[in-house]
Regions:
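N-terminal and secondary-structure boundary signal
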Residues: 1-128
Length: 128
């Protein structure tokens, strides 16, 4: 698997349009039918004309209906307490397991995610 990155920042005043993003994606070799794993940091991309949706639409247009875009939407708050980095006291694990809310693909919020992730999840064709 090849890993490539696009750098859009020239300075914070840079205005980026969907067409600019498409051009850079095509220069990276993104083509119709590809499978992309995308982790975006849109807060550092300058001014996005159209916001995160402009990036999403540029990606979708580049890969087309034949392609797939995968965006990580981790929900570590649903991990078993025994597997957490900052474990709660062991005597509370059973109660935590009993009272834990189940994962819900529409309602479970990705933790610490970029606004790009939240916008991506709002799109009709997205499966989670």
């Amino acid at each position: 698997m090849a890993e490539r990155s696009a750098y859009f920042i020239e300075n914070e005043r840079t205005v980026i349009h969907k067409q600019d993003i498409k051009i850079q994606l095509e220069q990276l070799g993104i083509q119709k039918g590809m499978l992309l794993i995308v982790n975006a940091d849109t807060l550092h991309m300058g001014y996005l004309n159209g916001g995160c949706q402009a990036v999403i639409e540029a990606l979708m247009e580049c890969v087309g209906y034949e392609g797939t875009i995968v965006v990580p939407t981790f929900t570590p708050q649903y991990k078993d307490p025994a597997c957490q980095k900052d474990k709660p006291p062991r005597q509370q694990w059973q109660e935590i397991r009993k009272q834990a809310l189940p994962f819900d693909r529409k309602l479970s919020e990705p933790m610490g995610a970029d606004p790009f992730v939240y916008q991506f999840l709002r799109n009709d064709a997205v499966l989670r």
